Amino acid sequence: MKNKTIKVDYLARVEGEGALYLKIKNDEVADVQLQIFEPPRFFEAFLRGRPYYEAPDITARICGICPVAYQMSAVHAMENAFGAVIPNEIRELRRLLYCGEWIESHTLHLYMLHAPDFLGYDDVVHMAKDHPEVVKKALRLKKIGNDIMNLVGGREIHPINVKVGGFYKVPTRNDLMKMYDDICWARDAAIETAKFAASLEFPEFFQDYECVSVVHPDEYPFNEGRIMSNKGIDISPEQYDFHFREEHVEHSHALHSRIRERDNYLVGPIARYNLNYEKLTPLCKEIASEIGLGKEVYNPFKSIVVRGIETLYSCEEALRIIDNYRMPDSPSVEIEPSEATGYACTEAPRGMIYHRYRVNSEGLIEDAKIVPPTSQNQKTIESDLRNFLPTVINLSEKEMVWKCEQAVRNYDPCISCATHFLTLHIERE
């Protein structure tokens, strides 16, 4: 294999439509292009002219797996614009809603999408034939995450109970306690999940990432905090555009993100873990140590293990919130719209999301900017592939493509119903 061009005309399980192009010349990697068409650009356009209070419901439709991330980013940005002060009781309910999303999303990715790659199965259906109890446990764990979203958010997919200022309706303590035993089971299942993920075989592949994440002084980040990196960034969401920029590339409709004056960066579970390890619970740290996960991770293939730890954290955090729950005096606070610009960053399961809205005096959105984690990671995925390909270049074409699938899947780009996300066509020089 001296010269070879590999074209992948369609990538499923990414945020929109995409393709992969790999060029090998004289047994060396000549070019890597991950081409992604990104739906959120359309959402920015048709948000213009809409009332501010429609933003949470509209942006939730960007993703069916992590709608809460887009809703939370929208409500926080609007509340930032209007100077709204949110009571702690509502803030805690929002964290609980986010716990549900992390549990269901991480579980879906870990067991249904990524584990089959490591275990040599085409998909989870084939995996279930040999590991039925593992898959049954995964389905129950995911359902518990969905149940939390349903209870707090009004429904599992595209929740309808979230509003700028709080919620339309809040659960009673009895409502939450009905889920308590299930979440206790989920906590134990999450421990087993982290151990299962750590038992998989990982290639020796490490990258010097600039990790970027929301960082909160007191808690593992969901909704609030500063934007920080392991290489010196420490800014508020209002300063995002001064430090990060998006750029057009010829081979993709999606925008590449980079740090100004530097280059690509990493968002997602590994970035969060590396920057927020000390905010994890004692049990999370204990399990991480037991399975050989240090305080920092730079092997992207081990993102599946970090997702296991974050699933455990989400279960523990959900139990803590329920234990201390007190119904707010009102489901929401009053919002007084004004001419303003609002900014927010929250942590989707896949990584940090940035929202910026400019609103006029009538409360209508004049401009919107949404930067999802997949677009932020696109340049880093290409970098991973460029550095990883030389380690698998002598494998058969089938094995090489399979390894590339794993490398892309580390980032959980998005979910679709496709069985495989690479349809391979080879053009020989």
Regions found by a protein language model. Give the residues of each.
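Active-site bordering "gate/hinge" segments
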Residues: 1-352, 372-429
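Active-site catalytic microenvironments in core metabolic enzymes, especially phosphate/sugar-handling
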Residues: 363
